[in-house]
Amino acid sequence: MKDFTLILAIIAIAILALISCSSSKKTQADTRSDVALAPQTIVPDTFVLPLIPEVLTDPGERAAYLLSHFWDRFDFSDRELIQRPEITEQAFVDYINILPSVSREEGDRSLMYTLGKAASDTMFYRHFATLFEKYFYDPNSPFRNEEYYLPLLQQFVQSPLLQEEVVSRYAFQLDMALKNRIGQKSNDFHYTLESGLTFSLYELQSEYTLLMFSNPGCPTCEAVMAQLNSSKPLNDALAMNTTSRTMLAILNLYPDEDITAWFSYLPQMPARWINAYDKEMEITRKKLYDIKAIPTLYLLDKEKKVILKDTSIEAIESFFSVVH
């Protein structure tokens, strides 16, 4: 992992150097002309970055140009490159590493451009679909990004280049990804406490709700619970709770069916949290939330709209550090 991080750091430095350059005194008309004439020759058996016109001096414009021409010199007719991850997959990782440098609209246009390039060959299209799934959807991917993945899924489910069973998988992913999106109201569900009392998420009155799906005894869950429980930004928010106003409620929900294990583990859960289980397995039965891995974290506002979806502890702490 350290080697992988080092590689990404080197890539980032190289890309920063690529998209930055000295100023130019050419007019806007000259710039448009020179950009239009920039040659992009396909180079076989390797990956070569596109030539960025020197007249583009703004780093944002250079990044946008790079993303909109990233694959222009790549030979999509050579299927042997699919079996060369040191070329194709490495170039793909370089590509998605640049996406945050531009606006979401420009990023989406670039993603569609990439799919269009890959669609020139069925096997390449399928390979790129797999890479997008691996890097944007896999819960363990450092590039995981549902907002980038959504427009791709919308294309995959309509593509005649993918096998029927693959389209079905992407259709399911699309259905789940469209639920509980950032800015939208989260799905309601019922949770049951140790006492046997049952409430709904929407009944929970708090300025913010940290929703955590976890399993008893799960090592990763234990680590996340410990980190959340000792988090200064979260503890500062919890300290603002009063009898008349709740700033932050942490709802730690067990979504599975081994209630005996949950009760056994309950004494180890933070007492200040709302520790509960899904008695009727409602979340699983109705597919209310996309729980790709355990634990999964959501941050909701007062109206139960999603602020952060399937997020990290760092993002949650950053939010409360700014807000409070």
What are these regions (language model features)?
Residues 200-230, 249-251:
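Short active-site neighborhood of thiol/selenol oxidoreductases, capturing the structured segment around
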Residues 18-20:
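C-terminal motif of bacterial Sec signal peptides marking the signal peptidase cleavage site
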Residues 1-8:
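Bacterial N-terminal signal peptides that target proteins for export
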Residues 263-298, 302:
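Short, internal strand/loop/helix patches
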Residues 293-296, 302-324:
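Non-catalytic, surface beta->alpha helical segment in thiol-disulfide oxidoreductase systems
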Residues 225-267, 281-285:
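Structural microenvironment flanking redox-active thiols in thiol-disulfide oxidoreductases
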Residues 23-197:
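Oxidative protein folding and maturation machinery
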